[in-house]
């Protein structure tokens, strides 16, 4: 299973082609659009999300509600393109066109791809870099993840994501999984505790007022993953490694951990390793889940717990110093419309990116042409955990 995305932030559309989805999988557009809607939400989002009404259109690979086994093509229209047709259109324009020249960017923003991307691809207008490097592309990746989640749900694999920290305000209380499930969508910061949610909102408001931005930590929990997905044999087949790469490939993500993550460095091994237990109903299981569902690069049957660290968004309304690439003079960096905090929305992005990585690994592990084959093989693997 693989995918390709194309499109610019203010271009006419984002396009996704997904290859390798088994045939006979029931696809409901409303389920995909629900994920798209969640990505647009969250406290701290900017004005762009008031313009876009993200909804996907399926143009290939699905007929009468079921996948065909051929490549699936999805389109997400950029409503804001209406205001950018001349600037972002494919047709040549005159250098004397003043409307376009006003949008030329020569002052790169610290923390963005602007300067290095301009150097690498020899662009003198840095808009050619920022349009593709924009986090707008994550809308396409969420669409891919939504299809992946539909597939995984047919295998009784379910996802939950939440915010655990924004701008130093932490929701680090211990919750059972049922409490997390029932509370994550009850407020606009996607945090379990409502009192902590308000403190986070206040933190976001203060950053916005100061022309600044803040980051945070998000968590994705996956329930129902069968044992042995991934491999200890080869470095590039370790499932936790593949998930880690997927997470840090998301715009502004600078770190990833599993289970207790970096806290493991503070504790002795006796408090971090998860004891192995057995009963005739569940088979092998662990007495705890400090390692977040992984051993040796493979799923061990416990819930997979992925933590991702998002840096503050680098576009600031009180910009930092930069240098004009034409004059080499010092200036304040360019300002683009942006969010003051996108951590709640990013939790949705991480969830869907992880869903793709897991679906891809499963389809490599269990070769199949249609969903019924896959379901049969997953059932056998689950029995292995009891019978071994």
Curated annotation (Swiss-Prot):
GO terms for cellular component: cytosol. Its cofactor is FMNH2. FMN binds at residues 132-134, 251-252, 296, 311-315, 337. InterPro entries: Chorismate_synth, Chorismate_synth_AroC_sf, Chorismate_synthase_CS. GO terms for biological process: amino acid biosynthetic process; aromatic amino acid family biosynthetic process; chorismate biosynthetic process. It catalyses: 5-O-(1-carboxyvinyl)-3-phosphoshikimate = chorismate + phosphate. NADP(+) binds at residues 39, 45. Its EC number is 4.2.3.5. CDD domains: Chorismate_synthase. Pathway: Metabolic intermediate biosynthesis; chorismate biosynthesis; chorismate from D-erythrose 4-phosphate and phosphoenolpyruvate: step 7/7. Reduced FMN (FMNH(2)). Gene3D superfamilies: Chorismate synthase AroC. Keywords: Amino-acid biosynthesis, Aromatic amino acid biosynthesis, FAD, Flavoprotein, FMN, Lyase, NADP. It holds the Pfam family Chorismate_synt. It comes from the Bacteria. GO terms for molecular function: chorismate synthase activity; FMN binding. Belongs to the chorismate synthase family. This reaction introduces a second double bond into the aromatic ring system. Homotetramer. This is Chorismate synthase. It comes from Staphylococcus saprophyticus subsp. saprophyticus (strain ATCC 15305 / DSM 20229 / NCIMB 8711 / NCTC 7292 / S-41).
